[in-house]
From Swiss-Prot:
Changing residue 264 to S: In strain: ED3092 and ED3101. Changing residue 202 to I: In strain: JU403, JU439, JU516 and JU793. The chain crosses the membrane at residues 17-37, 58-78, 87-107, 115-135, 166-186, 202-222, 232-252. It is found in: Mitochondrion inner membrane. Changing residue 203 to M: In strain: ED3092 and ED3101. This is NADH-ubiquinone oxidoreductase chain 2. Its EC number is 7.1.1.2. GO terms for cellular component: mitochondrial inner membrane. Keywords: Electron transport, Membrane, Mitochondrion, Mitochondrion inner membrane, NAD, Respiratory chain, Translocase, Transmembrane, Transmembrane helix, Transport, Ubiquinone. Changing residue 190 to L: In strain: ED3083. GO terms for molecular function: NADH dehydrogenase (ubiquinone) activity. It comes from Caenorhabditis briggsae. Its main location: mitochondrion.
Length: 282
């Protein structure tokens, strides 16, 4: 079923690129909501399903009502959960775990991303940069492992959206690596073992260790943003220090507890995928 849903999502993504019909786009929104419901029905995450359905379908109706490209652009930003319009995400993620959480943070957003590219508003770059600053402040004040992961994923996705406006091919290529990495990070996160995913590899990835996918996403996007506005680039670099302080909370906890219980943490997969990430530079 997962393979079928993944292929179906890729099909909807290609379809959204081939057409600019609003009715077709709205149909894609509806089908992606159905996909989310199917993935979470087996885990009985009814609260998350209800919240997601109400939010997405309400925004979908507003998307049909407003013919202005600018209003539709903001509606899609809100549907994806791009910062600073990500306030509704926590109402959905509270009751989803494992691969459903990974899907919601990554692949669920792919068809929306290609539609967003087609109705791009140039001045929205400043809104996305402001969203990054808000994410860094939120990361600094949060201490929940799961919420830190969600906010960090939202922040990384903002970088992906920024990069998409500058280079579509490079960003989609990095999105695939980002998707694979999130599979490794979130697959151990479940109701029965809520802290098993917090291992040294996870902490180092979110601290932007060189040659990790989050490192590449930020470097490529910063190099393009610097051509656009050097002041915001400098401000973002200073604000990134807040996220380092927040994720040091993970490092302190890891250094003070027995890590033998984290032995099944996919270490071999990390050693395999990290060298492959270097290829993305070439």
């Amino acid at each position: 079923m997962i393979v079928f849903i993944s292929l179906f999502t890729i099909f909807l993504t290609v379809l959204s690129l081939l057409t600019n019909n609003i009715i077709v786009w709205w149909s894609i929104f509806l089908l992606m909501t159905v996909v989310f419901v199917l993935l979470n029905k087996s885990s009985k995450s009814y609260t998350s399903i209800f919240n997601y359905f109400v939010i997405q379908e309400s925004l979908g109706l507003l998307f049909l009502l407003f013919s202005s490209g600018l209003l539709q652009f903001f509606i899609i930003l809100l549907k994806i959960g791009v910062a600073p319009l990500h306030f509704w995400i926590f109402n959905v993620t509270n009751n989803i775990f494992n691969y459903a959480l990974m899907w919601f943070l990554t692949f669920q957003k792919l068809p929306f991303l290609t539609i967003l590219l087609q109705i791009f508003w140039l001045s929205s770059v400043y809104i996305l940069l402001m969203g990054l600053l808000i994410c860094y402040v939120q990361i600094f004040v949060m201490k929940s492992y799961k919420n830190l992961l969600i906010i960090s994923s939202t922040e990384s996705f903002n970088w992906i959206v920024l990069g998409l406006f500058f280079s579509m091919f490079n960003t989609l290529y990095l999105f695939v690596y980002y998707f694979l990495l999130m599979i490794l990070l979130i697959s151990k996160f479940s109701k029965s073992s809520g802290y098993n995913f917090v291992n040294w590899e996870t902490a180092l990835v979110f601290l932007n260790i060189p040659f990790s996918v989050s490192f590449f996403v930020k470097i490529f996007s910063l190099s393009e943003i610097f051509k656009f506005d050097s002041f915001f680039t400098l401000l973002l670099l200073f604000s990134m220090f807040l996220s380092v302080l927040a994720f040091s909370f993970w490092l302190i906890n890891l250094s003070m507890k027995n890590n033998e219980e984290l032995s099944g943490s996919n270490k071999m997969n990390y050693f395999i995928i990290f060298p492959l990430m270097v290829i993305s530079i070439i």
